[in-house]
């Protein structure tokens, strides 16, 4: 099984998402973060479940979508995936770490 490593950038994104939603509803904020984490967990059994990120031309940088959020990840090897960032579709796409 593949290990998921949430990079600091992705953890920061989760906190920002939580804080933004929690301004209206802490219950829904917790629910949204839980859904994002559950969606990412499918990568443990299928690293290639996501599609290639259109902003980058690499088979190893992929995304899975949950609602308006794109979970961007990099396949490091057959045992490790880095979750790089969580991107809301309405926002400008940031540069990825090299």
Stretches with model-predicted labels:
Residues 48-78:
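Basic/aromatic recognition patch in beta-strand/loop cores that engages polyanionic ligands
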Residues 66, 74-98:
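Enriched for short, Lys/Arg-rich terminal
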